[in-house]
Amino acid sequence: MAAAASVDAYLAACPEDSRAALEHLRTMIKAAAPEATETISYQMPAFRAHGRILVWMGAFRDHCSLFPGSMALIEAHRDELAGYRVAKGTIQFRPDKPLPAAVVEKIVKARLAENAGRSRR
């Protein structure tokens, strides 16, 4: 996938199933952090608040991913993520099996709290 200039452009370039899954994830992230702004970071959609990135998301050949930016957050919710592939810094999910909204909300709110406590870049 070519580098996208916006989150909308990134999503438009995704296959339909991945686009739908990431649109759903985008909605959950925005609900948990309405003050967050969208950006492209590391050639992926990202959400920024308090001057820092909260989370990234991306579409790949066989899965979609949420990148919380904190392995500690992934570990804290490992039980709730049973059935999803958890790798170094990422939570992978198939487009037909979205992440639970409650877990996304907890992760995003925890990242908001982390970022609020850090100095602005």
Features from the language model and the residues they span:
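Charge-dense, helix-prone N-terminal extensions
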Residues: 1-121
